Amino acid sequence: MSSFAQTSLMATLNHEGTISTFYGVNALRQAHAAAVSGDVITLSSGTFLSTDITKAVTIRGAGMDVSKAYDIVSEPTVLGGNFNIKIPAEDTGRLTLEGIFHNGNIWFSEGQVKNALFLKSRFKDISQSGSCKVQDLTVLNCRISESINVEDGNSAQFLNSVVKTFYYGNMSFSHCVILDSDRVSNGGNEYKNCIIIDERGSVCFSSSSSAYNNLFISNNTNLLQYVPNNTNLRVPTSDERFAYLKGYNDSKDYKLTDQNRDVLKATDGGEIGIYGGSLPYSAIPTNPQITKFNVASKTTADGKLSVDIEVKSGE
């Protein structure tokens, strides 16, 4: 019997039901090069070299985080290196990124990205840096450790996500934790059921934005002077009940405690923050995971190569 090599880095490409397989750190690059818009690329755990995304494909990893609650895989899917998103305007497909960890820069640089979905992933910095049109980006169950900027005239919605800070664009936030509220003074945004931290105490909420059932942690007593409803609550930054929420760290879960969960209710009567609403935060990807992929070190006598694959379902 042949001995088996260690588990390999692997990417599978699904094109209309036909599966192609690629191996090693360049597997994502090779799969993307072979893909067409609408195809699905699934990555195993491990670190892959990133690639500029020029097609509206789905890229699914094994997860952005591994915790004791998530024992399906042993490590996340990491994309190494900065990359651009430059999908031609005539490509009407939907770009989806799920279950990945990225600690570099992502730029919307060319073409058009419409109705893209970033799901259950951890990003560092996402920005628009060129002529790219970003329309109706959805960020769901994600973490952004530094910032996101889609620029004026572009749009994004954030659902049950942790965002350190954001800059320009028409944005809506529901059940989010915003750790640096410097840009809540931007007009035209919407905030519902969020926890919003203002440690500087220097911002004032825009009269052209809307806010419902948000907890603001701020020393600025005039923060909400232009908000016509009384559904929001402001507490000072010295309030020890919420001190643990300040600052970004990948190890933080940003959960409300029994002590502060009932300080303010969401619009549906439930919990504010990322664990409330109909899409509570979870780092576990929705797609099945490749948990084992072993390849024999040599072929059999008849020239065949033994492969051992194990797949488990995600959420």
Regions found by a protein language model. Give the residues of each.
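Acidic Gly/Asp/Thr-rich repetitive segments characteristic of extracellular carbohydrate-active
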Residues: 12-49
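Short, compositionally biased P/S/T/A/G/V-rich stretches that sit at domain boundaries
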Residues: 270-305, 312
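Right-handed parallel beta-helix/beta-spiral solenoid domain characteristic of secreted/periplasmic
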Residues: 57-107, 126
